[in-house]
């Protein structure tokens, strides 16, 4: 199993998604969706090569879908770095 690290940008993305969900869908649904991300992080840690490579967006990056959002990550040795969590916006300007 790989270690998972969240970038500061990914942490901010999680906060933004949570607050948006709480405001538009209620706290219970926001909690449910928030915890779904951590379930996906665990799945990524168990098999990070399972998910789609998106070298055309950023070399070395992969993408995993969680609901309507995309988790962008890269593998660094035995660590998975979660770089950003984006909705439908164009990823290039947002990815480090």
Which residues make up each language-model segment?
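Basic, Lys/Arg-enriched alpha-helical interface segments
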Residues: 1-57, 61
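Short glycine/serine/threonine-biased micro-segments
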Residues: 24, 65, 85
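Basic/aromatic recognition patch in beta-strand/loop cores that engages polyanionic ligands
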Residues: 49-79
């Amino acid at each position: 199993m790989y270690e998972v690290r969240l970038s500061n940008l990914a942490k901010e993305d999680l906060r933004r998604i949570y607050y948006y969900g709480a405001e538009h869908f209620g706290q219970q649904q926001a909690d449910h969706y928030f915890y779904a991300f951590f379930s996906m992080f665990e799945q990524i840690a168990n098999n990070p090569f399972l998910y789609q490579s998106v070298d055309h967006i950023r070399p070395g990056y992969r993408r995993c879908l969680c609901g309507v959002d995309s988790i962008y990550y890269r593998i660094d040795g035995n660590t998975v770095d979660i770089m950003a969590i984006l909705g439908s916006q164009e990823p290039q300007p947002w990815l480090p």
